Amino acid sequence: MESILCVDIPVQMISCTDTNGKITPMRFRFRDRNSEIITININKILSTDQDHSSLGANFVCSAEMYGTQKTFQLRYNYHAHEWRMSRIGG
């Protein structure tokens, strides 16, 4: 059974934006419960929703954290220009 942790954590993101405005997240970092900075290198983007008529772009990505493959749900807010992590799945 997969465990899912719902969170709302601001993240620092390194992403690439092409000339058409398509965003590709590459690496992000955040503070864990112990206030340690955790850096995550994104291995694969599983799904994306970048509808420019909405408030932001949603990404589901897979990456390794603490030696285990995890799924992360990330959101970029077009108006606030900020990235947030909303879910971590195991």
Question: Residue locations for each model-derived region?
Answer:
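Cysteine-centric segments in proteins
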Residues: M1-G90
